[in-house]
């Protein structure tokens, strides 16, 4: 019997560092320079670039100042909760920094007028309305591999219909086909996304599982692959309405960070999404200011540095809207107290909170 050429070297005199250098050089010759390196070396340490979500509170709750580039993001929630609005605000923030963005509209439901109101530059926004799920994911793969895209949104995973389902008869049962499609696509995409430093945001819908006795019956579409590959998962919910007298002018929204590979998860933040405007910056700054102790609240009155902002939240919002310099001053003070505010977000957002079971299923 031939003796195995590979054997464990037990001789203590063998220099381990030389053996390691030989192994590393062999790997680099086979797979190219940079295929393996020490994590702490100057060449390998890369600071994570982020893109703001358009919400200061959510940027703070994410722990790194926004959504990370070169990663997969999932935004999910019920209908009309603000999923597409949040994605479009992220695109608008990326475009302000000169980034190139794309929108794969699988639902064929993007409203360009609303997108423009949120600050999206439509002239420089790439949009595709594919016919099948395979086509949508192939377009996504091509755009990511180009290395020229900063933010790419896929709206939505539920609308990525496999070609076999479209070509088949209405009522045909094709179990697991969409999940297999997503699993294969994410296996291909994940390395390209990291190398190209492109952020890919998947918008997802919620479904109810039948026969669930304990825990939340909610689950997201497209199987479990996206839950594993996503670095950040955001659960967005509408929790109330914003009214001016009797007219509803916006939604009160809660976003929970149910998964975060970049910072501690389970933080949640609340803000207003105003119709035709997007995230209400003034309302959010007032709420965050009160939490951080920067804006004082006495009864119904709000004040900052002994200057009264208004009686009632809506009046204070109007005052700040008319005084942009004061608005910027409060925002700068809040950014300096970001660590304190982040701790406040954990008060109601532990892993035992309602709705987390849906993220774990």
UniProtKB/Swiss-Prot annotation:
GO terms for cellular component: cytosol. PROSITE patterns: RECA_1, RECA_2, RECA_3. GO terms for biological process: DNA recombination; DNA repair; SOS response. The keyword NADP does not apply. Belongs to the RecA family. Can catalyze the hydrolysis of ATP in the presence of single-stranded DNA, the ATP-dependent uptake of single-stranded DNA by duplex DNA, and the ATP-dependent hybridization of homologous single-stranded DNAs. It interacts with LexA causing its activation and leading to its autocatalytic cleavage. This is Protein RecA. It comes from Sinorhizobium fredii (strain NBRC 101917 / NGR234).
């Amino acid at each position: 019997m031939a003796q195995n050429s590979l054997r464990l070297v037990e001789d203590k005199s063998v220099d381990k560092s030389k053996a390691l250098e030989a192994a590393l050089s062999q790997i680099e010759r086979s797979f190219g320079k940079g295929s393996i390196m020490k994590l702490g070396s100057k060449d390998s340490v890369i600071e994570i670039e982020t893109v703001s979500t358009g919400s200061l509170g959510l940027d703070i709750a994410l722990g790194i100042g926004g959504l990370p580039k070169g990663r997969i993001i999932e935004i999910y929630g019920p209908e009309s909760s603000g999923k597409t609005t949040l994605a479009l605000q992220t695109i608008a923030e990326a475009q302000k920094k000169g980034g190139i963005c794309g929108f794969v509209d699988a639902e064929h439901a993007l409203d360009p007028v609303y997108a423009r109101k949120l600050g999206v530059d439509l002239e420089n926004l790439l949009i595709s309305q594919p016919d099948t799920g395979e086509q949508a994911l192939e377009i996504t793969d091509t755009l990511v591999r180009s290395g020229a895209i900063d933010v790419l949104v896929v709206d939505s995973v539920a609308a990525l219909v496999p070609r076999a389902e479209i070509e088949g008869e209405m009522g045909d049962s094709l179990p697991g086909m969409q999940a297999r499609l997503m699993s294969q696509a994410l296996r291909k995409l994940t390395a390209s996304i990291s190398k190209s430093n492109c952020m890919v945001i998947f918008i997802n819908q919620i479904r109810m599982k039948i026969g669930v006795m304990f825990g939340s019956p909610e689950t997201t579409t497209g199987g479990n692959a996206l839950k594993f590959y996503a670095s950040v998962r955001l659960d967005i919910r509408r929790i109330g309405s914003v009214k001016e007298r009797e007219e509803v002018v916006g939604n009160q929204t809660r976003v929970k960070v149910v998964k975060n590979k970049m910072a501690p998860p389970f933080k949640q933040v609340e803000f207003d999404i105003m119709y035709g405007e997007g995230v209400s910056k003034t309302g959010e700054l007032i709420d965050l200011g009160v939490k951080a102790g920067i804006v004082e609240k006495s009864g119904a009155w709000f004040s900052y540095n002994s200057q009264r902002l208004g009686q009632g939240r809506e009046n204070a919002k109007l005052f700040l809207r008319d005084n942009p310099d004061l608005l910027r001053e409060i925002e700068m003070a809040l950014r300096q107290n970001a660590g304190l505010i982040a701790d406040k977000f954990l008060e109601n957002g532990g892993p035992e909170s309602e709705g987390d079971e849906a993220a774990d299923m």
